[in-house]
Amino acid sequence: MTQENIPVQPGTLDGERGLPTVNENGSGRTRKVLLFLFVVGFIVVLLLLLVFHMRGNAENNHHSDKTMVQTSTVPMRTFKLPPPPPPPPPAPPEPPAPPPAPAMPIAEPAAAALSLPPLPDDTPAKDDVLDKSASALMVVTKSSGDTNAQTAGDTVVQTTNARIQALLDSQKNTKQDAGSLGTLLHGTQTDARMASLLRNRDFLLAKGSIINCALQTRLDSTVPGMAACVVTRNMYSDNGKVLLIERGSTISGEYDANVKQGMARIYVLWTRVKTPNGVVIDLDSPGADPLGGAGLPGYIDSHFWKRFGGALMLSTIETLGRYATQKVGGGGSNQINLNTGGGESTSNLASTALKDTINIPPTLYKNQGEEIGIYIARDLDFSSVYDVKPK
């Protein structure tokens, strides 16, 4: 900086160098600093507001999650006792005996309406009527004119029926003459079905549900018997809100000894279920495998050796006897054959033994603890024993 550029300050001596002034740019820098501080403060305030807002949302979400966890979707279940039976109504007084109805005459048969006028040569005879109106029958003796009228009426009816039958036959022949296309143009008529709503789905176990169950008893199809199983999965209502059959409930049933050759399943009918709370309901539903197949599979004992063992042994004895007979017969002429006719008797014994044992039925065994299914064959309504109480 040269000497000429330095302004002369008052109160200084000539030739003395004074301090440079800073007042020219001081006000501009102050405004910039204040603007910067204002912007920084505004950003800090926005950040604080954003932090408070996010914290409030997090607390609200936590509170709503806690409320959702504490609130159960399954309403509380209570039991209600059935109402006491109403008292028997008093016996109604006996009505007075109705007066006897007057006897009404029985009309003559309708065939008399078709009577024709008598011929000139015929002399109508007088009707001889035996009136028994008080009884259930009335005997009427008709004259020859009435007999002719009856015959004429029967002839008219037969003629009319013959004409109607001829008309129907002609229509049938017309349809047959139309060919196979006319027959195909008539579809099968089916009945319509109306939709309906299920009653109170909160306490309804709908038809078609499958109950998973574990056998408590061993099944042996030698003789008919009873069976029991334990429910292994909770069963809820049709809308999934109310627990109807708890896990651990006992189901009882029965089976028949009807296994035949070629069959690998046994039919079991499950009749009743009892819950741990003492609720019982009739099932009357068939047993199934875990996938819903009809019947319960198991181990099959076909009793092969019992059925064919005796016949095989007798056949073997017969074969060995014939072989020995041939050996003995070919040894020389001085040998005596003592087995003459023995082969036929042994064959008869084998046939008899096979006839007695061939019809032994197979036996199915199924051990306890195996998983089975029960196909619900009807809608089960628990509304008479269960009720829901709002929280």
Curated annotation (Swiss-Prot):
Its main location: membrane. The lineage of its organism: Bacteria, Pseudomonadati, Pseudomonadota, Alphaproteobacteria, Hyphomicrobiales. The VirB system could be required for the establishment of the replication niche in the host. The chain crosses the membrane at residues 33-53. Coiled coil: none annotated. InterPro entries: T4SS_VirB10/PtlG, T4SS_VirB10/TraB/TrbI, T4SS_VirB10/TrbI. It is a single-pass membrane protein. It comes from Brucella suis biovar 1 (strain 1330). GO terms for cellular component: plasma membrane. This is Type IV secretion system protein virB10. It is found in: Cell membrane. Pfam families: TrbI.
